[in-house]
């Protein structure tokens, strides 16, 4: 199980926007969190939120199964990271 922690200082998202190579404007909401990958220290990462999704509240989370998908050639891939509160 992958453990994710959102600290109180990370309870908001930042918006990154611009124009794609195809000339279309885009906007992404990103939130910082720490992911425990089993090493000595957790790793600070950015997760992209779904459009209209509020920021995750501070707390402990795990990765929801909908974050994974099967790729074109049958390999397991990570899709957009979605979190659920840890029990």
Curated annotation (Swiss-Prot):
Keywords: DNA replication, DNA-binding. The lineage of its organism: Viruses, Monodnaviria, Loebvirae, Hofneiviricota, Faserviricetes. Belongs to the inovirus G5P protein family. The record marks 16, 21, 26, 34, 46 as: Involved in DNA binding. Binds to DNA in a highly cooperative manner without pronounced sequence specificity. During synthesis of the single-stranded (progeny) viral DNA, prevents the conversion into the double-stranded replicative form. G5P is displaced by the capsid protein G8P during phage assembly on the inner bacterial membrane. Homodimer. InterPro entries: NA-bd_OB-fold (IPR012340), Phage_M13_G5P_DNA-bd (IPR003512). This is DNA-Binding protein G5P. One of its GO terms (biological process) is rolling circle single-stranded viral DNA replication. It comes from Enterobacteria phage M13. The record marks 41 as: Involved in DNA binding, and in the dimer-dimer interactions of the protein-ssDNA complex. Transmembrane segments: none annotated.
């Amino acid at each position: 199980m992958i453990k994710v922690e959102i600290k109180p200082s990370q309870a908001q998202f930042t918006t990154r926007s611009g124009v794609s190579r195809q000339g279309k404007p885009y906007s992404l909401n990103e939130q910082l969190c720490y992911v425990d990958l089993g090493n000595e220290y957790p790793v600070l990462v950015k997760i992209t939120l779904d459009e209209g999704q509020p920021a995750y509240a501070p707390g402990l989370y795990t990765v929801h199964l909908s974050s994974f998908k099967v790729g074109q050639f049958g390999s397991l891939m990570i899709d957009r990271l979605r979190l659920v509160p840890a029990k």
